[in-house]
Each structure stands twice: as structure tokens, then as C-alpha cells.
Design a protein with these regions (language model features):
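Soluble extramembrane regions of membrane proteins in the secretory/endomembrane system
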Residues: 1-198
């Protein structure tokens, strides 16, 4: 589902339509990688590629379940989380990120490499329902829904539209890392479909 979402985002940004007009102030680098289950090697390989130096921020699309709504479960800071707030149906809470920080969640995502090894700022979005189907024979297209796909795709597209149209001085324009440091924040969805962020 994340791969389909990324491919559709690429199409939306390269062939804008009346329905998805896109004005870009910042570029997008789409990364489709593998090797997550073997020590995040796909992200580690990207980290040593010359194009990695062009990246400041990221939106990581994941799957830890077979459907439901895509949830924002980790964010580096309040500033990048505000991009996610632009989506029509944001879903997520800072509490899930606390689970990772406290070691309650044992698995990892490329978020770890992007933040710890590459110094980027960004967001981790994933499916988490039903978690019991993750990495089983039921973790397939037959056991998910179009609504789940549309939720991930919609939030990804709207988040990236906000990120690429951001003209603030928060992030450098020179194409080189460092990406700066954001402010810690508290965020959660409230009385759907809105999201609140405090920093």
C-alpha cells in the first residue's frame, strides 16, 4: 500500500491536474527500498548514496498491519507535524511515539536511520490494524480495503503538498543538510477530522 501511495504521489507531483494542483517550492525525492527486516539495510544503503545529501525531511510510509487508517505514530518535531495537520483526515497521537522511545515497541522502521544516522526531520506513518495479520499469509490485498489505501494516499499527498509549498526559513534552501532542529511537540487527533499540535 505504501508503494502504491508513493507511485501515485509521484504522478500527482509530475502531472498535476485540476483536482490535485501542485505548486512546489521544494523538491521531492521518492525512495522505494527494501531490506527493512534485515537491519534497515535499504535505508542504510540510501544514507551513503550522494543523493541522500539533498534530503532535509522525510515522510516514511510503513505497514505494521494490513489496514485500518494510516496513523502518524512518530514525528521528530512540531514543525514537520504541522504539515501532516494539513491532511483532511489526520489520525495519530504522540503517545505511540512514546512507546518507541520507552522500548515498548521492539521493531523499527527506516525512521531510525533517517533521524539517527542522517540527521533528518520527519514523520512515520503506518497501518497498525489488525496487527495480528502483519507478516502473515493474511497480510495481503485481499485482507485490506480501498478505504485504507485512500487514507494513506490522501494523507501522504496532502502532507507533501504542505511540505513542498512551505516557504518558511525553518529549513535551508541550499540543498545540503543540516535540516535544523525543531521543537518538541504534543500532537493528537481531536474531534475528527482535525489534529492539535502544541510545542
Amino acid at each position: 500500500m505504501a508503494v502504491v501511495s508513493v507511485l501515485q504521489v509521484i504522478q500527482a507531483f509530475t502531472k498535476p491536474s485540476r483536482r490535485t494542483p501542485v505548486q512546489v517550492e521544494r523538491g521531492i525525492l521518492a525512495l522505494l527500498n527494501n531490506g527493512e527486516e534485515d537491519y534497515l539495510n535499504g535505508a542504510r544503503a540510501f544514507a551513503i548514496h550522494p543523493m541522500a545529501n539533498l534530503s532535509h525531511t522525510f515522510l516514511n510510509l510503513e505497514g505494521a498491519g494490513a489496514g485500518g487508517r494510516a496513523t502518524l505514530f512518530r514525528s521528530t518535531d512540531a514543525e514537520v507535524t504541522k504539515w501532516y495537520q494539513h491532511s483532511k483526515r489526520p489520525f495519530g497521537t504522540v503517545v505511540s511515539g512514546d512507546g518507541f522511545k520507552r522500548g515498548m515497541v521492539k521493531s523499527q522502521t527506516d525512521y531510525k536511520v533517517f533521524t539517527e544516522n542522517m540527521g533528518m526531520r520527519g514523520l512515520d506513518v503506518a497501518f497498525w490494524e489488525p496487527r495480528s495479520r502483519y507478516h502473515t499469509t493474511d497480510d495481503d490485498v485481499k485482507h485490506t480495503s480501498k478505504e485504507s489505501l485512500w487514507h494513506m494516499l490522501g494523507t501522504a499527498l496532502e502532507t507533501l503538498q504542505a511540505a513542498t509549498s512551505d516557504t518558511s526559513r525553518e529549513f535551508d534552501h541550499d540543498g545540503e543538510i543540516p535540516a535544523g532542529v525543531g521543537h518538541e511537540g504534543v500532537w493528537f487527533d481531536c474531534m475528527r477530522p482535525s489534529q492539535l499540535i502544541w510545542s
